[in-house]
From Swiss-Prot:
Residues 111-117 are annotated as: Complementarity-determining-3. It comes from the Eukaryota. Residues 24-117 form the Ig-like domain. Residues 79-110 are annotated as: Framework-3. Its main location: secreted. This is Immunoglobulin kappa variable 1D-16. Immunoglobulins are composed of two identical heavy chains and two identical light chains; disulfide-linked. CDD domains: IgV_L_kappa (cd04980). Residues 46-56 are annotated as: Complementarity-determining-1. It comes from Homo sapiens (Human). GO terms for biological process: adaptive immune response; immune response. InterPro entries: Ig-like_dom, Ig-like_dom_sf, Ig-like_fold, Ig_sub, Ig_V-set, IgV_Light_Chain. The gene is IGKV1D-16.
């Protein structure tokens, strides 16, 4: 069974909150991908300048609020399955799903939350 997994850039309203470095541009790739249950899926996020490890990953399903998966680039939120992992620092980051499950059909976002200017 093919699964469609979308990776899209999070809107400016979530990328730029008070005190954030909103001059930092985030680029995700791929913009979309097709994968099957059991596949290893990798989504990358690149910052236009170094953000140390100030990066979070979110999963959003239709008609649902975004769910936090990863914070500080590689720390798994409580209750998130261990098949999700994050890595990277500086400008290049990766979200990996080690074995895609049917419930992982969703849109995935990265968000930078670099320190105050």
């Amino acid at each position: 069974m093919d699964m469609r997994v979308l990776a899209q850039l999070l809107g400016l309203l979530l990328l730029c909150f008070p005190g954030a470095r909103c001059d930092i541009q985030m680029t995700q790739s791929p913009s979309s991908l097709s994968a099957s249950v059991g596949d290893r899926v990798t989504i990358t996020c690149r910052a236009s300048q170094g953000i140390s490890s100030w990066l979070a990953w979110y999963q959003q399903k239709p008609e649902k609020a975004p769910k936090s998966l990863i914070y500080a680039a590689s720390s798994l939120q409580s209750g998130v399955p261990s098949r999700f992992s994050g890595s990277g620092s500086g400008t290049d980051f990766t979200l990996t799903i080690s074995s895609l499950q049917p419930e992982d059909f969703a849109t995935y976002y990265c968000q930078q939350y670099n320190s105050y200017p």
